[in-house]
Regions:
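Bacterial N-terminal signal peptides that target proteins for export
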Residues: 1-8
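Outer-membrane beta-barrel porins/channels
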Residues: 23-37, 42, 112-518
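Outer-membrane beta-barrel translocator/receptor signature
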Residues: 40, 52-61, 67-147, 229
Length: 518
């Protein structure tokens, strides 16, 4: 488990309660939030819609849309993604941009049966697709002049709360050998060996920071990569050109990795130049889900549809690592006896933590309608329900009591942090001969119970155009999404002494779908 303090012996992980459980509640949400994805055509319409068919995005959206196919096709959608992140931390503004090209943002093949003119079931189609359901790529940097606290203050509060003695902190440290190097088993043990915290007496608590007075310039960096990709198998049929039904099964593969550093640069400190807190996480996982969908054509000008998607049942394996690095004024620091000493270490890694757990993502349901403007195009809209409050996480990696506490703790945190939402998408397509023009907009509601004066809803804007021939089609699309989030480097007993970074993201996707009929 990811805990910032896990002292061996008689000290249990202080943060294996609230903070650790909230971390895994956040993980469940991260792997459950679906971005705009699919073909350029559907992304240009504002996202995947419940009441429109004849597009390969129906394979993982509403599989009933496969019933509209009257010929087979194969298509691929390369995507270029650019993410601009702006941070605001203690009044300092920073901007970071990052771009990435993916050859196969979406790839699909649809195989359609011959029409049955004499039967009620006119035709059916089988589809297979590969799609990037989520991209975890993000990079940001924040800076700020902090006169109130440092990460060091959090370590002091944690170790004093634990009541750990110096001998217990020593037991949580392995000096290693000349080839292996030092290794700590808790954050306080690392800070103790670096003389960043000192005991008040032989028995330890209360510990004090080696410098608790100097202001500092804080610099934080975050770099994340990875994606949630899905292979989907789907089947859809057409009953009498009125009722379209379909079902699909999706297999997910999740890869997520981040590296985070918080550097405290001390200003005019008699002891410290800077202290770095390093953190890294690598996650891999697999999951499975299923979707059932229906579309009903009321008349040539109007049709409505809906789909139900089960939670994705997934399992994850993670490795969490941390390290502490310090740089001292003139290479020396004041020790517990009040004299200047030269520390034996300036960099201490912590033992990596492996953990395995399972997540049940939200149930999803979509309902929509489409109005056709004769042969000139259509307008379509979709309302989507997402049950974020129903997410679950559990594990069998710990002992029975630990497994139970993990399950109950994450359920409690999910209910306290997240709420069910209703998302809305609207799009339209205009046709002139073989040419198509498209536009769309989507609103993804804020899933957090506590808004914290930050609106975390997302707005999605999209435009696109395409051409359709007898044997070939091509669609070009572009999307813009905006969102806000909050990152708090550390918390203290007094909320007035620490700050949070507000992160504003703008994500631009440009995609090209090319395909052929056969």
């Amino acid at each position: 488990m990811r805990t910032s303090i896990a002292i061996s012996g008689c000290i249990v992980g202080l943060l294996s309660g609230f903070n650790a459980f909230s971390q895994y509640a956040g993980d469940a949400f991260r792997y459950s939030e679906i971005n705009q994805n699919g073909t350029a055509r559907f992304q240009s319409l504002g996202g995947n819609h419940a009441a429109i068919g004849g597009d390969a995005s129906s394979i993982f959206g509403n599989p009933a849309g496969l019933g509209f196919y009257n010929r087979s096709e194969v298509a691929i959608t390369p995507v270029y993604t650019s993410v601009n992140s702006k941070t605001d931390y203690i009044g300092d503004i920073n901007n970071t941009s990052k771009g990435k090209f993916n050859l196969a943002g979406h790839a699909s093949a649809v195989f359609t049966s011959q029409p049955g003119f004499q039967r009620k079931w006119k035709r059916s189609s089988f589809g297979i697709s590969y799609s990037r359901q989520q991209s975890f790529r993000q990079e940001y940097r924040f800076t700020g002049f902090n006169q109130n606290s440092a990460y060091l203050n959090k370590v002091v509060e944690d170790v004093n709360r634990s009541g750990a003695t110096p001998s217990q902190l020593e037991a949580d440290f392995d000096p290693g050998t000349s080839s292996s190097g030092p290794l700590a088993y808790s954050i306080p043990a690392a800070y103790y060996q670096l003389y960043l915290i000192n005991p008040s007496g032989v028995n330890g608590p209360p510990y004090t920071a080696v410098d608790n007075e100097s202001p500092l310039e804080q610099v934080g960096t975050y770099n994340a990569t990875g994606a949630n990709t899905q292979w989907t198998l789907a089947y859809g049929g057409n009953y009498n050109d009125k009722l379209y039904v379909g079902g699909s099964v999706g297999i997910n593969r999740i890869r997520y990795k981040y590296d985070r550093v918080l550097q405290d640069n001390y200003v005019d400190s008699p002891e410290l130049n800077w202290v770095d807190q390093h953190e890294g996480l690598t996650v891999t996982g697999v999951g499975i889900n299923a979707t059932l969908g229906i579309i009903y054509k009321v008349n040539p000008l109007f049709q409505f549809g809906g789909s139900l998607t089960t939670p994705t049942f997934s399992s994850y394996r993670e490795t969490f690592s941390q390290a502490v690095e310090a740089n001292y004024v003139d290479g020396q620091v004041t020790g517990p006896e009040g004299t200047l000493i030269t520390p034996d270490y300036t960099y201490i890694p912590l033992a990596a933590n492996d953990f395995e757990y399972r997540v049940v993502s939200p149930f999803r349901g979509s309902l929509g309608g489409t109005v056709f403007i004769k042969n000139n195009g259509f307008i379509t809209g979709t309302v989507e329900y997402v049950g974020y409050a129903g997410m679950r996480a559990n594990t069998s990696y710990l002992d029975d009591a630990g497994n139970r506490d993990f399950k109950e703790g994450t359920i409690r945190e999910i209910k306290d942090i997240y709420r069910n939402t209703v998302n809305v998408r609207v799009g339209g397509e205009y046709r002139v001969g073989k040419f198509r023009a498209r536009a769309g907009v989507g609103y993804m509601a804020d899933p957090y119970v506590d808004r914290a004066n930050i609106d975390r809803s997302r707005l999605l804007y999209s435009l696109g155009a395409g051409v359709r021939g007898d044997r070939f089609f091509a669609d070009l699309g572009g999307t813009l999404s905006t969102s806000k989030s909050v990152y708090t480097p550390y918390t203290l007993n007094n909320p007035a002494l620490y700050s949070s970074a507000v992160i504003s993201d703008k994500t631009v996707n440009v995609m090209l779908t090319v395909g052929a009929f056969f």
